[in-house]
């Protein structure tokens, strides 16, 4: 709605969720929003940004979605609970964390953060 020039693809393995996104896009006349029923590891279209929430460990997330990341400028964003030090240590050698943003969720007394990653140059 705010950025009509930005294409957004919401990928989910659950067909009903992808269909809901498609229906919402039609109802709201959002030509730039797409619901995609697929597994992230099957995507071949390059994306500038790939994000996830409650999906997988960081190593699995970057491994499974790597073929869809637009290299060399693409970035990954992963919402996690507390700072995932063990997952960061287990990342592939060519993947770097370049920012971790701590989040405060109103009404939720739990740690949350967003981890920003990219392929090392």
Feature roles, as predicted:
Residues 60-76:
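A short glycine-rich, Lys/Arg-flanked "PGG" loop and its adjoining helix->strand segment in the class I
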Residues 1-52, 62:
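Conserved SAM/SAH cofactor-binding pocket of Class I
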Residues 13, 55, 79-83:
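Short strand-turn motif at the edge of the Rossmann-like AdoMet-binding core
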Residues 5, 83-121:
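Active-site capping/gating segments
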């Amino acid at each position: 709605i705010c950025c009509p020039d930005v294409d957004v693809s919401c990928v989910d393995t659950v067909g009903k969720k992808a269909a809901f996104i498609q229906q919402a896009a039609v109802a709201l006349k959002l030509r730039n929003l797409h619901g995609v029923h697929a597994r992230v590891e099957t995507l071949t279209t390059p994306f500038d940004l790939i994000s996830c929430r409650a999906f997988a460990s960081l190593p699995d997330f970057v491994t499974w979605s790597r073929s869809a990341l637009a290299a060399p400028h693409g970035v990954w964003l992963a919402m996690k609970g507390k700072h995932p030090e063990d997952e960061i240590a287990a990342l592939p050698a060519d993947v770097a964390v370049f920012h971790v943003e701590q989040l405060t969720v109103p009404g939720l007394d739990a740690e949350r953060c967003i981890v920003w990653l990219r392929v090392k140059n």
